[in-house]
Regions:
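Short S/T/G/P-enriched beta-strand
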Residues: 1-29, 41-42, 55, 66-130, ...
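Aromatic sugar-binding surface patches on proteins
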Residues: 53-60, 155-163
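Short amphipathic beta-strand segments in non-cytosolic proteins
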Residues: 34-49, 135-150
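Assembly/interface hotspot detector across virion components, adhesins/toxins, and nucleic-acid enzymes
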Residues: 50, 104, 152-154
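A broad, low-specificity signal marking well-ordered, structured residues that form hydrophobic/aromatic
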Residues: 35, 58, 86, 137, ...
Length: 226
C-alpha cells in the first residue's frame, strides 16, 4: 500500500496482494485467471488485471474517482476463500473551482440586513473537499459599498458558511469565494439588495403652494426614503 493518502483521481492506486497457499503451506500457482478482486460498490472504482508476481502471490491495482472507503473482496473460481476483504481509503483531490458553487440566502435581502453565503467545495470528480483555508469571500456590485463579510465556517461536509452584513446601499451584490487569491467557484452568486420599508420619519411631502382655491390645482411632491 502507499505510505500516504491515496487521492480519488483515477490515477493514484493501491496495490492489493493475495498470497495463496494450500493446507501444507505450499504456494498455489497459476490461479491469476481464476481470481477476482471485486469492489462492494463499483461506482468510480477500477480494478486492474490480476497478475502472479511470484509463485502463489497475486497482485492488482485499485484506483477510484470516488472519495471514501472502498471495500474489496477476493473471490476464486476454484477455491473457497471465505471472507477475504480489504478496506481502502481514498481522499478528495484539490479544489476544482469549475465544479464548486456558491449560493446566497435570502435571494432578495434588505439593506442593513444579513445574507448567508453557502459555498460547496468540490474536486474535479465532484468529491466534497474539506481541508481548505479559504479567505473571506469577495464582494462586488453597488450593494457591496458598506457591506462586510465574515470568514468561512467549515461545516465538515464540503460546504462552508459565511455571513454578510449589508450596508445601506441597494442594488446588485456579487459574492465570490476565494482560495489563495483565486476564484473558488465556477460563478459568483448574485442577489439584488432592496431598500427597506418606507419610513415616515425619513420621507417628506411638500406642496408647491400653501393656499389653493377650490377648482385650482397644485403640485404635491413625495420624497420617499427608507
Amino acid at each position: 500500500e502507499p505510505s500516504g493518502d491515496v487521492v480519488a483521481d483515477g490515477q493514484q492506486a493501491y496495490t492489493l496482494t493475495l498470497t495463496a497457499v494450500d493446507s501444507e503451506g505450499n504456494p498455489v500457482t497459476g490461479e491469476a485467471s481464476r481470481l477476482r478482486f471485486v469492489p462492494q460498490d463499483t461506482n468510480g472504482v477500477t480494478v486492474g488485471a490480476i497478475s502472479e508476481i511470484k509463485p502463489g502471490v497475486y497482485s492488482a491495482t485499485v484506483s477510484s474517482t470516488r472519495a471514501g472507503n472502498v471495500v474489496v473482496r477476493a473471490f476464486s473460481e476454484q477455491y473457497q476463500l471465505g471472507t477475504l476483504q480489504q478496506t481502502l481509503k481514498f481522499v478528495a483531490g484539490p479544489l476544482d473551482a469549475a465544479h464548486s458553487s456558491i449560493t446566497l440566502n435570502p435571494d432578495k435581502p434588505v439593506v442593513g440586513g444579513t445574507v448567508t453565503a453557502i459555498w460547496t467545495a468540490k474536486d474535479a470528480y465532484d468529491n466534497p473537499v474539506t481541508s481548505l483555508t479559504p479567505e473571506a469571500p469577495s464582494l462586488a456590485g453597488a450593494a457591496a459599498v458598506g457591506s462586510t463579510a465574515s470568514g468561512w465556517t467549515n461545516n465538515g461536509d464540503g460546504t462552508w458558511t459565511a455571513q454578510i452584513t449589508l450596508g445601506s446601499t441597494a442594488g446588485e451584490l456579487e459574492v465570490m469565494p476565494k482560495l489563495n487569491g483565486q476564484d473558488a467557484a465556477a460563478n459568483a452568486a448574485k442577489v439584488t439588495v432592496v431598500a427597506d420599508a418606507l419610513s415616515s420619519n425619513q420621507s417628506k411631502v411638500s406642496v408647491a403652494e400653501d393656499h389653493v382655491k377650490a377648482g385650482e390645482s397644485t403640485t404635491v411632491t413625495l420624497i420617499a426614503k427608507d
